[in-house]
């Protein structure tokens, strides 16, 4: 395999492992994959997530909150993780699937999308609107696949090409690990 980077430098590899979402995998590797893979009917769903840090708010003794809301699906309290020792409150906010679908192509240019998620979080929790010292939004156009495929991963020995990712098995992080582990076993 020969990979050309943005700076036009070329690098050669004996094997290639792709961990990209299905629509991108299909474009990159369709000539090297079996039709039973490229003909899969995979529907990838979008996701919009905001990271926000509030200054000096009381420590909140919960790890996450699930909302019954049209915009905000859940919030994770990053301070509840033992690896963090912080005097600021760190939160990860995740939009609903419906709202993510509606805003995925606009979030990079429309700051109101990030601000709406943050204000919704404040309204739904009743937390004080303390000074926000950090906020960042990111969206994944191809974030989730809720339907399992017949495969956990793919290894094409002829081309030394491997493919793995959470979308093979489901929407969770553990599905990505299961897929990668399965591919590692196939490679040997």
Predicted regions and their residues:
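Anionic-ligand binding region
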Residues: 60-93, 101-103
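Generic structural signal for small/hydrophobic residues in well-ordered secondary structure
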Residues: 17-19, 52, 93, 135, ...
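Conserved mid-domain beta->alpha element of the FAD-binding
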Residues: 156-188
